[in-house]
């Protein structure tokens, strides 16, 4: 079994080491709960009839909901990671309809400091 990149010391990391997370299936309850928590009741997420006529043809998860779940799927050792300082280059490549199972794949990109 490969150890998660976030749990290894820098000198034990191998370039390109990959880890794939467990899955998380997006449910209707997830969309409703996220809408209630954030106040984002856009009909693409909340209105079945409206979403059926949209370019996606159905309700889809909020991008930030998917991103939040993706972060929760990361294999992070709480003794090593103290805080999230930022996220670079987040791109939402395709819609995530209800019933979709998401997974996160992480890999090591080693950039030694000067």
Give, region by region, the residue ranges found by the protein language model.
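Catalytic strand-loop segment that frames the active site of acyl-thioester-processing enzymes
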Residues: 1-61
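HotDog/MaoC-like acyl-thioester-processing domains
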Residues: 1-15, 20, 92, 96-114
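Hydrophobic beta-strand-centered segment that forms part of the acyl-chain substrate-binding groove
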Residues: 52-111
